[in-house]
């Protein structure tokens, strides 16, 4: 009795420490959500203001969706985004695999531009420890055509807060071409989502061990047959898919965690239930 009390107390102590650690993780203040990347050298002309907002991360189709806004003028309250362009301008944007041009004519309203950036490295199969890397290169030219235009310096602001994701951004500007900026996005799942997904997979593994243990002990006659255990194991069969549906981020079925844990946990519970039913059918538990 004393040993069980000590073990139970240690278990509650570990649970309390884990609760405190998660609490500290929740109230932790991270880096600023808005990052500003200004030209490294003093621009010879007026810089083009670019505001990039991360709208979503789609790990299934390997893409990061952005919304770009541009401003060339300033009102008394601040920058005037989606205002009229003060000159003919062409903005080149590319992610290393594809490139597109955004063209504005003098006086044309610069509306928001949606953009999808391909993920260069990362695989959703590694869920919940999947990490992704993507790059976005931008350059602006003060002309209706790139070939005849003079490069315009860029002052880029990025809003990186996105629920369920932890995003880091860095910028590089080649010394030979200071008007070109390359943004590198590092994306991974939020710490709490990783913890929650890992906990669910651990719960599946524990349920599998319980099911195999109960079924084996009943079948071997170590424990007396109890039909209540059959009901519990039958409930586990349907509980496991429900737990899988609670995975944060809705990962596609078949990720590595499913192959290593969920699939075998479901089979283990079914085997445990089959052993229990077989024990009841042959009446071994009543001997």
Give, region by region, the residue ranges found by the protein language model:
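N-terminal signal-anchor transmembrane alpha-helix
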Residues: 141, 159-190
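Membrane-helix boundary elements
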Residues: 1, 22-27, 179-197
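Alpha-helical transmembrane segments forming the membrane-embedded cores
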Residues: 191-287
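Hydrophobic secretory-pathway targeting helix
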Residues: 1-35
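Hydrophobic alpha-helical transmembrane segments
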Residues: 143-150, 173-183, 200-218
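Soluble non-transmembrane domains of integral membrane proteins
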Residues: 25-42, 46-163, 168
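Short, charge-rich amphipathic segments
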Residues: 3-5, 66, 166-173, 192-195
